[in-house]
Amino acid sequence: MPMSSFKRKIKAIQIKIASPEVIRSWSGGEVKKPETINYRTFKPERDGLFCERIFGPVKDYECACGKYKGKKYEGTVCERCGVRVESREARRKRMGHIELAAPAVHIWYLESIPSVLGTLLNMSTSDLENIIYYGSRRVIERAFIVTDPKDTPFSQGDVIYETEYRIYRKKWDFEVEQAFVVKNPKSPVLSDIDGEVTLKTEKSITGREITWIIVKNITRATHTVLPGMILVVKDGQEVEKGQDLTKEMTIDPVYAPFDGHVEIDELSNTITLKPLTTSKDQPVVFTAPYGAKILVSNGQKVKKGDQITTSTSLPSVKSSISGTVRFGSNLNIRALEDGNFEVLSTGEVYVEQVIEERKYPVFEGALVYVNNGDQVKKGDHLADRFLFEEEYLSATEYKIFESHYPTMFDVEERTENDRPIVVITDIDPEVSKETGLKVGDIVTENEYEAYLQIYPEKIVADAGAQAIKKLLQNLDLEALQAEIEAELKKLPSSSSKAIKLRRRLKMVKDFLKSGNKPEWMVLEVVPVIPPDLRPMIQIEGGRFATTDLNELYRRLINRNNRLKKLLELGAPEIILRNEKRMLQEAVDALIHNGSDSEGKRSRRAVLKDRNGRPLKSLTDLLKGKKGRFRRNLLGKRVDYSGRAVIVVGPHLKIHQCGIPKKMAMELFKPFVLAKLLGEGSSSKTMRKVKKAIIEKEMPEAWEVLEEVIKGSVVLLNRAPTLHRMSIQAFEPKLVEGNAIQLHPVVCPPFNADFDGDQMAVHVPLSAAAQAEARFLMLSRYNIISPAHGKPISLPTQDIIIGSYYLTTVSKEFDSLKEEDVKWKFSSPEEAMLAYHLGFIKLHTPILIKVVINGEEKRIKTTLGRVIFNSILPEDLRDYNRIFDKKQINTLVYETFKRHGIDRAADLLDDIKDIGFHYATVSGLTLSLKDLKIPPERDEILRKTWEKVRIIEENYEKGFLTEEQRKSEIIRLWMSVTEEITKLTSRTLAEDPFNPIYMMVNSGARGNIDQVKQLAGIRGLMIKAYDPRSREIKSKIFKGQAIHEALTFDYPVDKNLREGVDILQFFISTYGARKGQVDTAMNTSFAGYLTRRLVDVAQSVTVAEPDCGTHEGIRAMDLIKEGTVVEKMNEFLFGRVLAKDVLDPETKEVLKNPETGKEYTRNTMLTDDDANFLASYKKMVDVVRYEEIDITELSLPNMYAEIAEPVGEYEEGTELTWDVVKAAKNEGKYRIKVKVYPVVGTVYAEEEPLYDKKGERQLLVYQEVINEIVAKMLEENGIEKVPVRPDIIVRSPLTCESEYGVCAACYGMDLSNHKIVNVGESVGIVAAQSIGEPGTQLTMRTFHVGGVMGASDIVSGLTTVEKTFEPYAFLREEKSGGKKEIRKYYGSESILCEVDGFVKDIATDESGRTVIYVEDYAGNIHAYKVPKRAKVRVEKGQKVLRGETLTSGAIVWWKLLELESEKGVMTAMNLLKIIKNAYVQQGVSIHDKHFEIIFKQMLSMATIVDPGDSDYLPDQLVPLVDIKRFNREILEGNAKVEENRKWVIGKTLAKRIIAETEEGELVELAQKGDEVTEELLKKIIEAGIKEIDVFEKDKVVTYQILPKEPIKYKRRLLSLKKAALNYPGWLSAAAFEETAWVLTAAAIEGKVDPLIGLKENVIVGQLIPSGTGLDVFAGIQVEETPRAAVEEELA
């Protein structure tokens, strides 16, 4: 069956911001209605969220109305319902869209940290939110009232707020008074006195009416005045008693002035003289004076000159009292020219004397209850109020009311208002210059209106998303880039403004580079995802369950439609604003319904369903464990799989598993069916018949199944899949029952046991998959762990006890002499016969002839040992050894090394069979009697309690402190516990066949600590604690031993065999609970650690056979604080040499005398090689004098100096070819030299080497000896030194492959002990190797012993976490501009910056300890010790660069700065710390796995000087990119001259902006201009280094000036940061912070080159690793029929 070869279809994936046009192009139509389906017909509503016209048909190849049915109409669009006839699969692909009635901002770009919109527009997030959500600004300000508007559009009395007033005042002339706001006026207005009311109205300064209610209590004198009298007083005039009110006067008679007739009006006492009709005279009216007699009668004719009245005299009227004159209301008077009044009729003039008066001003609008002249009583209501609440009064008005109504109202001088804000989107340049405003400034609505009145049509401001859109549209990114770059040149690079500007510049460049337009961050169109991705299903009771997204879309459509309607109706702005805000919130909720990524609550309300559960938005669909990335793209479910409980299969071979028949039939059903159908008919009837055969389980079905599974393999997986050995391939064997049978030896890699564990089965389908599974994943090829290169599939428990029982002997065996042995046999067969006949037992001592290394020998042994050795390879047999767990492990490993993986696998099977058999034969049982309690125990305890009593007495007497008492007791009980443990072990060992002793001693189950608790003493118990608690930290700082702080000082002195009392039981519960809690908490933590490790390292594969580097790392013992963490042989194992290993004495390539192997560069080191090199050392001369012949063509192969002057070269100069040349010029043929053989070797003694005086260390262990040190040794008379070769091995850390590592730098594939294959996923293997044992690294019970520093506190997982997240445990404190980093626990460790000697440790004036280090040149370096740190060095001690001088945390960036560019020293320090944590738990992991992780953590660098790159200072950039850029710069600089000639005559593809010397930006050339020599010269002079030109319709960039390379600084990143800074955005988005990663990538228009494994799994193509490499892409795979011989073997 030939298979087509695969090709990688997708090369890269780019992410960009979608423009409205792109969103519309995706769409199948606009969704206009919020409806989903019709609840009567269950069909989707037209134009709704499930519309068939937009998204495709619900039924396969059938339109909505049913007119077109069947595949033949595919592609037809129904003219009746508008639905395209196609597969219903379309409903998973086709999208819709919603046209928004108003723009809405995409929430990701607003709420990202830092905010993209905020950075680009140079606005704070809070301001942006206020603009977008139509927010307001709280303003506390004064108000003013216009008193004189002059020539302005204001009216008198208009209120203007201070902000507006400042704006108006600059341009307009008008007068104002400060305004006061009335608060709490008391009402109504009551009269304080009895009296009469007078009302008076007047206008205030602001043009508003004030009514004065005047109440007077008065006495009144009435004076009658008569017609004709002349009043000499005015109304309101003050008069004294007796003063004249009228004149005393004589009135002359009245004569007729013309002819006419008289009319007399007695009522008004007037005489009217009317002229004749012929006359031109006018009628005249006379008042008849009081007392004068009228001489004519009514109607009488008179002649001119006739007397009409007689003369009379009128006395004066005098005032009877002092007071105010008031004219009576009936008084009829006429004003005279002299200011007096003539009385025309009788009336009254009053003189009022005011006893009491009150005035009540009332503001306009108040209701006055009284009228003029009304009499009121005290307490009567005059008006409903005098002022209104919130009334604005001018200063003058305020004074009036304040003087009349003190304490009856309050005022506010300043008002507090929430003013809606707007952002300026356009402004006239002149106005901008005048006002200082610019586009993007935020003003309140009042301010905007003020500006608009002054500068009509010259300023535009707006709020909401449309305002942001306008701002983004107005951005000229190219000009902005030039402007920011110009500003950055003027600023110091470390200033906060420069950092902010650089961030902004990066964003501008990203937009320019990606071709994204900033306004696309504001949505005009919202895409609607396909309906099958947000399904709606019917549930019981006829109701429908739907995805939250549908609810979010429904809200959005409802609000959008409502806004459209309001816009059509021309609704008021305030309603529209509210509706737009709600629309924005609906879009926000759809995209991201909830608080932002940092946990800071958003200002938006979270939309919830009726149960109060937040609705899941599009962001929730992507992020987290249940998001699209991790659940659907990276965690697909697979078909052809099953799951069942596992049971042990003792009869199976290591590569076999038992599959239940039913399960196998289901898994292989299609294959069985195909086989049953055979070549014959595949008609429907035949298929049904054959299916029935399978379903009814007829005998034929089982026969065919047996045939089908022959030669197949299946994959077994046990969750949690912590490493690659958790999935292995097995050949299936059909078994009865329902459980999968598993070979017991493969339990350790699966971490499986048979207490109810379940395993999953998967069937590889294709021939290629079967081949891969068989050759790569079969369990017999996976017995060696890729984590450490030792066997992992190993016998356990019963098998171990069986083998141990078989090979163990009685106590007398060793002392029995050969001649005393009763039984002697000539062959193993003879011995077996004797055993079966019952003459001897398995453990009876016998003498037997066996073949050892080809020779027949007679040995003393037992039959058990003979039986066991019979299954071993001949060269590994040992008849005098007990085979416990450790021995069996060694045996399997040695078999693998000597005889290969297949023989090792067969041996495991044989051990399994023999172990199970003899475990059964042993009849192992357990009884209480087997727990032997040491007889001396009681006496030891009695003495100990006596010692405790003495300590307590000393404490009570005051000889000991509380801490000392506790410490003494704890140490006492610890030593006693140790003593009893040894006794218990010794007591049990008295009987080698004691079941408990056999179990513990063989390593089958349990350990001596458990036996100690069962039969000896439980000992001291630990308290439950939190390592981060203040109490613990304070104890550390006090220097108290931490184990003492956390231990009960009362022991459990009983054991479990005899039982404990109640108090001891309760003390025990602490430790028991702690164990449970730690395990539970650490499991999830270890899982998270593994996940971070995988994410960091997943793209590291073996990229090439050899990168060619000569760099490497120095092989050494890893020593942490005096403890050897890892021996050099372990360090060397599996490595490849970077340089030849030279013999320290001869300086020739070292050769292994046993194997004859030479250790040249690129040699891979096996176990034996590592052991040889690690143990190889020699005593070598420090110096020797030689005379060399310079006529030879070579110099000495070791460091040499001339021992006599040669030409210009003095004695002591290094011997070089230049020196030889000078000697030849002098005619010399031989010169004396001093040769230093020790230079370039490594000091190999653990004890330091001291100088003559014994004061100063000259050499320390593992120090590489250089010429300076060699001369010191010479000066101190040291002749020979023990040294070993300097071994430099290749490492992933120093590998120079651009992606991943090369095979030579990685070295051995630990799972097969061969050089690693190209394509191996070494990153994933590294992450699994480190993460898999994570659960074992629980918080450990602390070391026993002396006072410990902070380093001893937390080991295990916390140490691992601290190493992989180095900055999570450091706190930055800025003081005086410097960064000071403090440790999470304790202080910072001081690093030595030079090689030298500790000259002195002294205290300075301030009391601080100072370490003085003298370097080789004699310079002194002083290091101040932090207060809480402990000095780790002594006077005279030798210290090397990068060593720690004090306790505390290493500040990694300081260490990185100290070393070379590679970061090796930092990595080795990290390695020591982390290895220590794993070694303490007995976990073995090869260093190279850690190195791969550290390589990834060191894969980024911070830009110090960007040179001519687009990067910014302090930007974090992958090291690979920097190196590639610098390489390209060197290549580009070489082509500058050539490019200058080439661009002449080409057309510019971009305009060119440059900065003048004055700092102004000028345009040198437009897009489309031709490049002339003159223009090119201008461009070059302006310092522009590259230009874009058109070349055959393509834009090509040419470099025309040399460029500067990037200068950078290596960075050590935490795991999380390294994963988030991964070059491909797909993997980073699937890791954490999905929204932010996608946002940043979209802005940048980032291209994911799909180099890692995760990215390729996400896009659904073969991973670029192993057989997924392009090398294998063209391979054709086909199945061939198996040969008959093969069939038989199978």
UniProtKB/Swiss-Prot annotation:
GO terms for molecular function: DNA binding; DNA-directed RNA polymerase activity; magnesium ion binding; zinc ion binding. Its cofactor is Mg(2+); Zn(2+). It is an enzyme of class 2 (transferase). Its EC number is 2.7.7.6. It catalyses: RNA(n) + a ribonucleoside 5'-triphosphate = RNA(n+1) + diphosphate. Zn(2+) 1 binds at C63, C65, C78, C81. Zn(2+) 2 binds at C1107, C1295, C1302, C1305. Belongs to the RNA polymerase beta' chain family. Mg(2+) binds at D753, D755, D757. The RNAP catalytic core consists of 2 alpha, 1 beta, 1 beta' and 1 omega subunit. When a sigma factor is associated with the core the holoenzyme is formed, which can initiate transcription. PANTHER family: DNA-DIRECTED RNA POLYMERASE, DNA-DIRECTED RNA POLYMERASE SUBUNIT BETA. One of its GO terms (cellular component) is DNA-directed RNA polymerase complex. InterPro entries: DNA-dir_RpoC_beta_prime, DNA-dir_RpoC_beta_prime_bact, RNA_pol_asu, RNA_pol_N, RNA_pol_Rpb1_1, RNA_pol_Rpb1_3, RNA_pol_Rpb1_3_sf, RNA_pol_Rpb1_4. Keywords: DNA-directed RNA polymerase, Magnesium, Metal-binding, Nucleotidyltransferase, Transcription, Transferase, Zinc. Binds 1 Mg(2+) ion per subunit. Binds 2 Zn(2+) ions per subunit. DNA-dependent RNA polymerase catalyzes the transcription of DNA into RNA using the four ribonucleoside triphosphates as substrates. One of its GO terms (biological process) is DNA-templated transcription. This is DNA-directed RNA polymerase subunit beta'. SUPFAM superfamilies: beta and beta-prime subunits of DNA dependent RNA-polymerase.
